[in-house]
Curated annotation (Swiss-Prot):
Protein location: Cytoplasm; Postsynaptic density
Residue ranges, annotated region (Disordered): 451-470
Listed Pfam families: RhoGEF, SH3_1, SOS1_NGEF_PH
InterPro entries with a match to the protein in the record: ARHGEF9_SH3, DBL_dom_sf, DH_dom, PH-like_dom_sf, PH_domain, SH3-like_dom_sf, SH3_domain, SOS1_NGEF_PH
Function of the molecule: Acts as a guanine nucleotide exchange factor (GEF) for CDC42. Promotes formation of GPHN clusters.
Gene Ontology MF terms in the entry: guanyl-nucleotide exchange factor activity
PH domain sequence ranges: 318-425
Chief localisation class: cytoplasm
GO cellular component, one term: postsynaptic density
This protein's name: Rho guanine nucleotide exchange factor 9
UniProt keyword terms in alphabetical order: Cytoplasm, Guanine-nucleotide releasing factor, Phosphoprotein, SH3 domain, Synapse
Length: 564
């Protein structure tokens, strides 16, 4: 290492841990940053550079790159001619390796070394922290420990078996001949347990943050670290290790494939392992994103009026597709226009408000686990006795119930059919890895919705909970439905598009002017300007109380009264 630096070679290291510091002469960095090592004469503290910043940093916080690019002359202190000692936790660099086999040996040895080092970290977490926490029932409940540590013990057991198989495939005499690709393929299903841990990690950090406000917990965790003789890193740093580890596998396998000849017996296995691990990390990231978006689903549900039944988050975590279609539920039934929201496991049916088209009313849901999608050719359907175009069915095999849907265009029908296939695929993948939203995450989403301040103005109804009462006639109730700060003309322009008035309604309006205003309380004048023609969208004259089909009606913003 020293020979590389003194020989004007560039020695690069990758940060494994975050190093936050306020000291002037220390170098701050985050995990994943690349550091140029300038001085390694001290075994514990090295001098390095990131961009234009230089400073001291802990040597244990970084991992040297396997293959340094610059060449140096061989010296007496070279260790294993540039090989990484698999029995140590650090990389021993000597004379640079000049052929593919030697380069591959470097990568193999690094993988073995980091796996052994990682196993030690998992053991320290399970025995140094979790085991001690379970002894203190006065400080930790079972639920708290589940949130903080997640399924770390399952990961520890899995990694022990994985490393045992790696050891069997490792060729200690000629590391480049090792065939470790099959190990990743044999254990590919086991890596999915990281999904649960990664999804829970944010909750773990939040719970730890609350506990650390109490000095008792600070002292307890520090005592656990010292008792287990762990390096000087806080517990949240140790708990971050599995998240970092699962993201490192594709990088390591890509490096291994780079230095593996195509005629090597391990080449096709490494290539397949790389594809598998990339898929695992991609899916884990996708599920992490889904959990981060559950607050939006909870907020959407709160905006839907007249909600009934269980919450969306009780079964679903992703909105897959949404659109408006015509729908018939039973033979000879009436064609109804509905807005459909397809989630995993269920599809929610809503109806738009007649005036406020941005307001939705809950009208039911369909359990997608019980239905199959049936594509239908254009023509006439004998069961429903209707002509069909751009249609498809949802058929319940158990009850023989059928829902018939009509898309406006063929392209829209194709998108719906594709969305249904995606929904089934997502459900199957979630069942495979055991993905679900924890009760704690559901509570957090519900709390977030309650904390969102209700908006004022045109969109105020979108914040009203499902128990929103039916609209009331402002002439019979002493309250406004239109906020004082908004011009009513603006409100109605928003809710009803402008259109030319027919001669019938012009004559009708003149007829209304001749009708004597009913005798009401003195405060009626306060609400006279709230009247609106529900067909034309025009605001009526002050004091105009018009009649429709012989029955008095009054329409206001967001509250349309059909007195029929």
């Amino acid at each position: 290492m020293t020979l590389l630096i003194t020989g004007d070679s560039i020695v690069s290291a990758e940060a494994v841990w975050d190093h936050a510091t306020m000291a002037n002469r220390e170098l701050a960095f985050k995990a994943g940053d690349v550091i140029k090592v300038l001085d390694a004469s001290n075994k514990d503290w090295w001098w390095g550079q990131i961009d234009d910043e230089e400073g001291w940093f802990p040597a244990s916080f970084v991992r040297l790159w396997v293959n340094q690019e610059d060449e140096v002359e061989e010296g007496p202190s070279d260790v294993q001619n540039g090989h990484l000692d698999p029995n140590s936790d650090c990389l021993c660099l000597g004379r640079p390796l000049q052929n593919r086999d030697q380069m591959r040996a470097n990568v193999i040895n690094e993988i073995m070394s980091t796996e052994r080092h990682y196993i030690k970290h998992l053991k320290d977490i399970c025995e140094g922290y979790l085991k001690q926490c379970r002894k203190r029932r006065d400080m930790f409940s079972d639920e708290q420990l589940k949130v903080i540590f997640g399924n770390i013990e399952d990961i520890y057991r899995f990694q022990m078996g994985f490393v045992r198989d790696l050891e069997k495939q490792y060729n200690n005499d000629d590391p480049h001949l090792s065939e470790i690709g099959p190990c990743f393929l044999e254990h590919q299903d086991g890596f999915w347990i990281y999904s649960e841990y990664c999804n829970n990690h944010l909750d773990a950090c939040m719970e730890l943050s609350k506990l650390m406000k109490d000095s008792r917990y600070q002292h307890f965790f520090e005592a656990c670290r010292l008792l287990q003789q762990m390096i000087d890193i806080a517990i949240d740093g140790f708990l971050l290790t599995p998240v970092q580890k699962i993201c490192k596998y594709p990088l390591q396998l890509a490096e291994l494939l780079k230095y593996t000849a195509q005629d090597h017996s391990d080449y096709r296995y490494v290539a397949a392992a790389l594809a598998v691990m990339r898929n695992v990390t991609q899916q884990i990231n996708e599920r992490k994103r889904r959990l981060e978006n559950i607050d939006k689903i909870a907020q959407w549900q709160a905006s839907v009026l007249d909600w009934e039944g269980e919450d969306i988050l009780d079964r679903s975590s992703e909105l897959i597709y949404t659109g408006e279609m015509a729908w018939i539920y039973q033979p000879y039934g009436r064609n109804q226009q509905r807005v459909f929201f397809l989630f995993d496991h269920q599809m929610v049916l809503c109806k738009k408000d007649l005036i406020r088209r941005d307001i939705l009313y809950y009208k039911g849901r369909i359990d997608m686990d019980k239905y199959e999608v049936v594509d239908i050719e254009d023509g006439r359907d004998d069961d429903f006795n209707v002509s069909m175009k751009n249609a498809f069915k949802l058929h319940n095999k158990e009850t023989e119930e059928i829902h018939l849907f009509f898309a406006k265009k063929l392209e829209e029908k194709i998108r719906w059919l594709r969305a249904f296939r995606e929904e089934r695929k997502m459900v199957q993948e979630d069942e495979k890895i055991g993905f679900e939203i924890s009760e704690n995450q559901k509570r957090q989403a519900a709390m977030t919705v309650r904390k969102v301040p209700k908006q004022k103005g045109v969109n105020s109804a979108r914040s009203v909970p499902p128990s929103y009462p039916p609209p009331q006639d402002p002439l019979n109730h002493g309250q406004y439905l239109v906020p004082d700060g908004i011009a009513q003309s603006q409100v109605f322009e928003f809710t009803e598009p402008k259109r030319s008035q027919s001669p019938f309604w012009q004559n009708f309006s003149r007829y209304c002017e001749g009708i004597k205003k009913p005798n009401r309380s003195k405060r009626v004048s306060d609400y006279d300007d709230a009247g609106v023609d529900f067909c034309s969208g025009n605001i009526l004259h002050s004091g105009c109380f018009f009649y429709h089909w012989g029955f008095p009606c009054c329409s206001t913003a967001g509250s349309l009264q059909f007195c029929i």
